[in-house]
Regions:
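Conserved ABC transporter NBD signature motif
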Residues: 58-74
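Catalytic Walker B motif of ABC-type/P-loop ATPase nucleotide-binding domains
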Residues: 154-158
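Helix N-cap at the start of a conserved alpha-helix in ABC-type nucleotide-binding domains
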Residues: 165-167
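Conserved ABC ATPase "signature" region
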Residues: 96, 100, 108-125
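Helical segment within the ABC ATPase nucleotide-binding domain
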Residues: 169-181
Length: 188
């Protein structure tokens, strides 16, 4: 069964057509790539899938039902290309804040963050500020905060940007693990 189904999506900005009649099915547990040149509409399409934008025409089905951005947003993990981390905030506090925004209790969030931080060798980072991280370290933090609430759909926009080969492999391995455990993953 398709976790995500897009039917004839169109999006305009004034007279500019950003997305033109896109239809696709992404199955549960599938890893799916959105490919296209700059300006092809990939980011606009992602923003419609996440409920940031609404399509002007067409429909989005999520888990067999009409997509409801309010109800379904907690089932989606989105790591945008432009990172949204608060530079002055401590890493542990930021991860807790983002986890609780996604509906995790304090104790549940703390437990999951500790597990992911250990897995990514970030245990000692808890009290560091985001502004003190390299681009690759920030990328690891952003990945962790995207997946720690165990979303059904994970959307990753350039997830390997700024990572060295070792950390690229670590993220890649985790993406495959998440897929094997049933998460659906979309790359752009």
């Amino acid at each position: 069964m398709a976790l995500l189904e897009l039917q004839n999506l169109k999006k305009y900005f004034a007279t500019q057509k950003a997305v033109d009649d896109i239809s696709l099915h992404v199955e549960q547990g599938q890893i799916f790539g959105l490919l296209g040149p700059n300006g092809a509409g990939k980011t606009t399409l992602i923003r419609m899938i996440t409920g940031i934008f609404y399509p002007d025409e067409g429909s989005i089905l999520f888990d067999g039902k009409k997509f409801d951005p309010i109800k379904d947003v907690g089932k989606i993990g989105y790591m945008p290309e432009e990172r949204g981390l608060y530079k002055k905030m401590k890493i542990g506090e930021q991860a807790m804040y983002l986890a609780q925004l996604k509906g995790l209790s304090h104790s549940e969030a703390q437990s999951k963050i500790k597990k992911w931080f250990a897995r990514f060798e970030m245990d000692s980072w808890w009290n560091k500020k985001v502004e003190d991280l390299s681009k690759g370290m920030g990328q690891k933090l952003q990945f962790v905060t995207t997946v720690l609430h165990e979303p059904k759909l994970i959307i990753l926009d350039e997830p390997f940007s700024g990572l060295d080969p070792v950390n690229s492999n670590l993220i890649k391995d985790e993406i495959f693990n998440l897929s094997r455990n049933g998460a659906t993953i979309i790359f752009s």
